[in-house]
Swiss-Prot record:
Residues 157-178 are annotated as: Disordered. Disulfide bonds: none annotated. This is ATP-dependent protease ATPase subunit HslU. ATPase subunit of a proteasome-like degradation complex; this subunit has chaperone activity. The binding of ATP and its subsequent hydrolysis by HslU are essential for unfolding of protein substrates subsequently hydrolyzed by HslV. HslU recognizes the N-terminal part of its protein substrates and unfolds these before they are guided to HslV for hydrolysis. Belongs to the ClpX chaperone family. HslU subfamily. Keywords: ATP-binding, Chaperone, Cytoplasm, Nucleotide-binding, Stress response. Pfam families: AAA, AAA_2. SUPFAM superfamilies: P-loop containing nucleoside triphosphate hydrolases. GO terms for molecular function: ATP binding; ATP hydrolysis activity; peptidase activity; proteasome-activating activity. Its main location: cytoplasm. It is found in: Cytoplasm. ATP binds at residues 18, 60-65, 273, 339, 411.
Amino acid sequence: MSEFTPREIVSELDRYIIGQNMAKRAVAIALRNRWRRQRLSAEMREEVYPKNILMIGPTGVGKTEIARRLAKLARAPFIKVEATKFTEVGYVGRDVESIVRDLVEMGITMVTEEAKVKVQFQAEDQAEERLLDILLPLPSTGQGEGSAHFGLFGQMEGSSVKPEPTAQQKESRQKMRKMLREGKLDDREIDIDLKEQRRVPMMEVITPQGMEGINLQDMLGGLMGGRTKTRRVKVGEAMKLLTEEEAGKLVDQDTVQQVAIERVEQSGIVFLDELDKVCARGSETRGGDVSREGVQRDLLPLVEGTTVSTKYGMVKSDHILFIASGAFQLAKPSDLLPELQGRLPIRVELESLGKGEFVRILTEPENALTRQYAALMGVENIELVFTDEGIEALAEIATRVNETAENIGARRLHTVMEKLLDELSFSAPDRGGERVVIDAAYVNRQLSDLAADEDLSRFIL
């Protein structure tokens, strides 16, 4: 769990997201409270429940970006889902409990990767020995060959016994090891045997009630797995593949599952987007709105705290933090079920973005669009320079189109930038060595006619 203070979390989010200070403060406090809770006594820790958050704001103002950056900061199991992907129990589609199952899968992946890092050096040593056995095989005594037999799925069981290497063989092996570590053998092609990961065709399996935690695809994959497959690869690639396989053997999966479930239960974060799309609008409760209300009712126990069956065991959602968000343009937060409103006690409204924010978005973040496009053109040996006047003109046009057409917030900058640099991107390979300056005149020449025509801008920008 992250040990950042709320001020440090906000500062980190400021590197990528402009404005929206109230939303940043809310998620920063929530994240810090997870850290505080971990340091309480066991009895008190059980009583401290997360204060779930509802972020309200139009599209393109930073709700999803805040969630994405928070995931990297949290160093905790994190999943982003759309409420519209789920259906009420009894309808065809995914049920809301699959949110927790997916979160557990994220936790398993995270803990497994951490465990592999810890055994990396040991795995590399074992992979190196396997490579040396392939590059410089020792002669077999032949003893035990008669006892070899084929197993249930056709793989040979039993192997020849290797003799003790002679002094000369040991010396040759050390020379080969030195060449291997120096990278002199990286381009040589060899055949290696890897455990085959059987791919089961993707299919949607509707399981009976009570069997949701059983993954039939994993069961089928397990039945067909276990074989080895010979691949011809270069030594450098072989080292990576063998290291990965050896690391997998060294990791204790039972421990991984226990740690992952504990981490999900105590530190898991779910970002639930598009919650407004499952609201019954106003007084309408007919047709599809019945199913929408059903999704909300299914979410209630999950957000409040329940036990979900997964293939790794039972998982409690009592202390999972839920951050919900929605534009709420057609529906209002008050259209949510009262019980669900009560389980989202912290409300944060995000402001719409205007010209001033667009100028900052184009210049201040570390991953600003202007820097991204300059880097892309730099690959073609073109120096792309944006002047302050050019950025002002870009922000002005994006704001104007948002006002006259659909307001999609900062996402409008992507469409404007693509149209602005369309000709340059196409002809870049033929213009290597040039210096292209994007000033107000360049922007107006490329975009002003389109932005001025309201009907045309709806389709192009």
